[in-house]
Amino acid sequence: MDLASLRAQQIELASSVIREDRLDKDPPDLIAGADVGFEQGGEVTRAAMVLLKYPSLELVEYKVARIATTMPYIPGFLSFREYPALLAAWEMLSQKPDLVFVDGHGISHPRRLGVASHFGLLVDVPTIGVAKKRLCGKFEPLSSEPGALAPLMDKGEQLAWVWRSKARCNPLFIATGHRVSVDSALAWVQRCMKGYRLPEPTRWADAVASERPAFVRYTANQP
């Protein structure tokens, strides 16, 4: 595995990320959520992609792609491991979204290329990174109140918003993926909340990927 070459690719790709709002439809008609996981001891990469109507946030389509894992887990290079399955799930969708929430980092990455940015560049779609853990940067401690907010900073640059979406829950790290500004990324996540820690697009993607009770109930109620 030539990490020097991958690192150079990351730096080059990151320079192409658009950090301002370039949505083709604003507000969007369809918002997608994407979640990647691994099965069979990491040998299979599974990507779930869901489509929600906006503003109702009604689930209208979901696809799950499973492909052979092409790369081992290497911290800092996760997007190379995850994007092939995301592309496979993307190709399965019968209609394409105007905005994608990706479970993972956007520019809040040491070389500014998390999976949300990498995927957004590959398919040229506006993306937002919604991550559950910090990868780099620093932020001031948040109060315990829901809605507490602080910028995630690294070398004088804001990479994300750290936002406590729900009381007694760890905060989310919300970042530009591609073609969405950091402030708009936060605003879109806030518009897509329904009382859970995660916004609806990534909550549904996780539910589909892991066959959680919410998804089991949904499928049971389908004609």
From Swiss-Prot:
Any Gene Ontology CC annotation: cytosol
Any Pfam family hit: Endonuclease_5
Site positions for Interaction with target DNA: 73
EC number, UniProt record: 3.1.21.7
GO biological process: DNA repair
GO molecular function: deoxyribonuclease V activity; magnesium ion binding; RNA endonuclease activity, producing 5'-phosphomonoesters; single-stranded RNA binding
Coarse class of the protein's main subcellular location: cytoplasm
Disulfide bonds: none
Reactions performed catalytically: Endonucleolytic cleavage at apurinic or apyrimidinic sites to products with a 5'-phosphate
InterPro entries according to UniProt: Endonuclease-V
Gene3D superfamilies given in the database record: archaeoglobus fulgidus dsm 4304 superfamily (3.30.2170.10)
pH dependence of activity: Optimum pH is 7.0-7.5.
Enzyme class: hydrolase
Cofactor(s) listed in the protein's UniProt record: Mg(2+)
Residues that, per the record, bind Mg(2+): 35, 103
Keywords: Cytoplasm, DNA damage, DNA repair, Endonuclease, Hydrolase, Magnesium, Metal-binding, Nuclease
Subcellular location: Cytoplasm
Family matches, as PANTHER family: ENDONUCLEASE V
Listed NCBIfam families: PRK11617.1 (NF008629)
Free-text function comment from the UniProt entry: DNA repair enzyme involved in the repair of deaminated bases. Selectively cleaves double-stranded DNA at the second phosphodiester bond 3' to a deoxyinosine leaving behind the intact lesion on the nicked DNA. Has a wide substrate spectrum. In addition to deoxyinosine-containing DNA, the enzyme cleaves DNA containing urea residues, AP sites, base mismatches, insertion/deletion mismatches, flaps, and pseudo-Y structures. Participates in the excision repair of hypoxanthine and xanthine (deaminated adenine and guanine) in DNA.
HAMAP family registered for this protein in UniProt: Endonuclease_5
Quaternary structure annotation from Swiss-Prot or TrEMBL: Monomer.
Family per similarity comment: Belongs to the endonuclease V family.
Listed name of the protein: Endonuclease V
Source species: Escherichia coli (strain K12)
